[in-house]
Amino acid sequence: NTLVYDYDQPASFWGGNEYLNFDTKDMRAATAAIQEVRLEDIYEHYLYPNTPRNNKPYTYFPDVNGDFIPRTLQGALPEREGDYTWVHFSLKPNGKGNSETYIYVLGKFNNYTPSPEYLMTYNATQKMYQARILFKQGFYNYSYALSPVLYETGFSDTSLENETYLDENGIDGNFHFTENQYQILVYFKGFLDQHQRLVGIGSANSMNINDQ
């Protein structure tokens, strides 16, 4: 007997784009993505304004697939000795900003969960969406996600269908060149089983996956 798996089209999903990043390992210095550093009550890091990438050609931009790495030059143990800093994000839309479109900053640092502290607000004077978010020192990947609805308590909002409303590619775009790390979980449910069973687990990188 032969078991044929032919579920390619329904199981397909968008490839996304490489993540954006910033690095605050040195609190007093502006790295490649940081435009300005200020010292108020604590350090404030202002990132260079971003623009949507969904209408631009793909550019290879090495990332850590949405992850983050705590690190500091001011101590040997970043998990304990790293400080906190306010990071300022700004996104310049292609057209006129829309106060009824909600944009969130997402990454593994917040488990990709939209909630009020990661919501951007539109600054009509500067014509940009802006957000001010508290981070521990380190290297972070992040991306922008669009939503037509406002998440007041993250995915715990019972009135919303969770991530169904999130468009994670509307700003950053989709490219088949994008390098991604995937984790595969295989479940099985027998005829007499009441629950599905996890029977296999694996991981693969899009750079070395083939159809064999």
PLM segments and residue spans:
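Sparse, context-dependent recognition of short Cys/His-centered cofactor- or disulfide-binding micro-motifs
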Residues: 7, 72-76, 118, 129
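Long, internal scaffold/assembly segments composed of regular secondary structure
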Residues: 1-59
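Basic K/R-rich, polyanion-interacting modules in nucleoproteins and related proteins
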Residues: 44-99, 185, 198-212
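Active-site-adjacent segment of 2-oxoglutarate/Fe(II) JmjC oxygenases
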Residues: 13-18, 169-207
